[in-house]
Amino acid sequence: MIKETSRELITKLNGFEINQTKDLVIRGQKYTFNVYRIPISNLNYNVKNGRISTWMQSNGEKIKDKSTTEINNIIEEAIYSENKDQMDKTMRDIEENGQMIPGVVLSNGVVIDGNRRFTCIRRLKRFTGKIDSDYFNAVILDEEISKNENDIKRIEYNLQFAAEERKDYNPVDKMYDLYHQVIETKNFTLDEYCAATKMKKSDAETFLEAAIVTKEFLDYIGCDKWDYAKKVNIHGHMDEIAKHLKYFKNKEPNIYEMMKLIMFNMEIVKPKKDVGKYVRNLTNNFKKAKEDSKEKFLQEQEEINEKIKPIINDDSLSYDEKIAKIENYDDEDLAIEMYNSVQTLSYVVETQDMNVSKKMDNIFQLLKEVDEDSVPFLPQRDLISLKNTTRCLEDKIERIKNKLNEYEKDSNQH
């Protein structure tokens, strides 16, 4: 049985009851709690919150050795900066209509639900000085609940995934929380996590696979901070990469690690902006390719990897510095090199059942569509690519001509 909030606890937080209640589901049962107005000076942010804990991974040094007041100010600014337009809109709404939706706080004054509203009220207090902005309306949980981290998490999830305002919760924050709770700390089994967050198990499994691949990617680039995944917005790519790596793990396990390396390098080099689509095309073509074409492609990718690997393994460089160095690799364009390798595989698959004559005719028809007058107007990157491709074409045509000459010479001798 969950106890009512004690008078002693209410007094400790200087709260006073208002004519409002809030329902919470705790340990599978629904309870109705009174709501209290609590001075914001008695409340603090929850550093174990999913969104805040992701931010903390990259910014923990900012709050090291800081006072509670300073920590609150730093986290407030981080929450506000993440989506200023939405926060300003919420601030205007609270200023005009008051705080309509109460939050939830622990017995020690830590806010576990309502971080955005708490942030808006703190900022309104500072910028408007209105008396109403001195208080945050919230349920106060008793000490028994406040000391049980799994109970707290379940309450957070119940509120987080049910509320309309949480639909824009960043996917990387969700992904990190799932990975942290199920894989790292094992606080929840996947089934328990699904029950707490109301996620379909199939969706959670897909999400967890993407989270595991994201962690592997971060390890690969030497970055232990999930916040970076949010910064570069890789969630959608990792979702796609995880799906296709699953195919190789199940169907072609002997090249699984190599394909993972190739896809991670694609995420780094970005031969095309839509990495997810690019990975999808690669997998589809690789499935159809003949063994000699697969081996040639893997060899090309291994050569690209040999250029990337020393940079990625250089611990003296930040991730951004690694990217800059890869982009300017000895005047070569690794993105173009990777793009050409994948496009070649695609073309080989498309024409692998044609004989040499038909392939050459097909190439000639494509070349007829090329507008040579547009060459001077190409961007520098495309000019470099065109020059490399033209040189490769010349070499290939020369080899074909030599074979034709050999054939004609042999025919004449006979």
Q: Residue locations for each model-derived region?
A:
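Short, charged/polar connector segments at secondary-structure boundaries
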Residues: 1-132
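An acidic, glycine-rich, mixed-charge low-complexity segment common to nucleic-acid enzymes
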Residues: 1-23, 34, 380-414
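Amphipathic, charge-rich alpha-helical segments that serve as recognition/docking helices
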Residues: 78-79, 132-215
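Structural motif corresponding to the C-terminal cap of alpha-helices
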Residues: 98, 182, 371-374
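Amphipathic alpha-helical "recognition" segments
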Residues: 129-136, 201-271, 278
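Charged, long alpha-helical assembly modules
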Residues: 236-330, 334
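Charged/polar low-complexity intrinsically disordered segments, enriched in acidic residues
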Residues: 306-391
